[in-house]
């Protein structure tokens, strides 16, 4: 018998301010990879993390 897939998946978090902000320290978009449990957290994740491009803590949202 085959084992079922695990509940944990790898997701990518992207800075929300990098897309619209033109006065940044450096060009580009900040992205972090992390894991989430699909069964416990069904909605999209949003975490405040440090963005090296904006040089401050910003909201990072889960992208596909």
Swiss-Prot record:
Domain of life: Bacteria
Entry annotated with the keyword Ribonucleoprotein: yes
A single GO cellular-component term on record: ribonucleoprotein complex
Keywords: Ribonucleoprotein, Ribosomal protein
GO molecular function: structural constituent of ribosome
Record InterPro entries: Ribosomal_bL33 (IPR001705), Ribosomal_bL33_CS (IPR018264), Ribosomal_bL33_sf (IPR038584), Ribosomal_zn-bd (IPR011332)
PROSITE patterns hit by this protein: RIBOSOMAL_L33
Gene Ontology terms describing biological process: translation
Pfam entry (one): Ribosomal_L33
HAMAP family: Ribosomal_bL33 (MF_00294)
PANTHER family membership: 50S RIBOSOMAL PROTEIN L33, CHLOROPLASTIC, LARGE RIBOSOMAL SUBUNIT PROTEIN BL33C
Family classification: Belongs to the bacterial ribosomal protein bL33 family.
Record-given protein name: Large ribosomal subunit protein bL33
Species, as recorded: Synechococcus elongatus (strain ATCC 33912 / PCC 7942 / FACHB-805)
């Amino acid at each position: 018998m085959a084992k079922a897939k695990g509940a944990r998946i790898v997701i990518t978090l992207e800075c929300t301010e990098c897309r619209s902000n033109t006065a940044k320290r450096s060009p580009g978009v900040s992205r972090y990879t992390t894991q989430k449990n699909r069964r416990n957290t069904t909605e999209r994740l949003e975490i405040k993390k440090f963005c090296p491009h904006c040089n401050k803590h910003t909201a990072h949202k889960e992208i596909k």
